[in-house]
């Protein structure tokens, strides 16, 4: 079975309902996902932090770009889904899942970039945390909801 954004979202939704209190709005537009990876530049071999991986739509594109991904996810149902859908990448070490709140869980120390589709309600506090931690990153790509961008 070939993975795509719509399939990953549908498989997660078959397991559980979307939790709007966690800001779970899943991105399925593969043109947007692809463009965000292209905008990030060459991620091959780079350690990328993804925040709020949800069903793995962005994760899929990061892995296809040969990034090494550490993905933080607060929702245990999404973690279980990711373990099922990306078991070979987890086994190979290309993907590490971190269950917890991105506002408080320790970030991996050796990340090169952050690429994330971040939930609206943590957008400002997350940006503040990254600025406070003075991380030395080659690139940060945040996909945000239109309301936050305005």
Model-based region annotation:
Residues 1-150:
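Catalytic cores of RNA-modifying enzymes
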């Amino acid at each position: 079975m070939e993975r795509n954004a719509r399939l990953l979202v549908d498989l997660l939704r078959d397991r559980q309902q979307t939790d709007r209190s966690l800001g779970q709005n899943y991105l399925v537009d593969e043109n947007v996902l692809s463009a965000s990876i292209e905008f990030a530049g060459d991620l091959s071999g780079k350690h990328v932090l993804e925040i709020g991986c949800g069903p793995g739509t962005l994760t899929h594109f990061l892995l296809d770009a040969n990034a090494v991904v550490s993905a933080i996810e607060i929702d245990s149902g999404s973690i279980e889904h990711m373990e099922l859908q990306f078991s070979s990448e987890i086994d190979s070490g290309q993907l590490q899942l971190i269950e917890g709140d991105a506002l408080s869980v320790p970030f991996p120390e050796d990340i090169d970039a952050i690429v994330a589709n971040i939930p609206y309600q943590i957008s400002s506090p997350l940006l503040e945390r990254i600025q406070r931690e003075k991380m030395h990153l080659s690139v940060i790509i945040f996909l945000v909801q239109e309301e936050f961008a305005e």
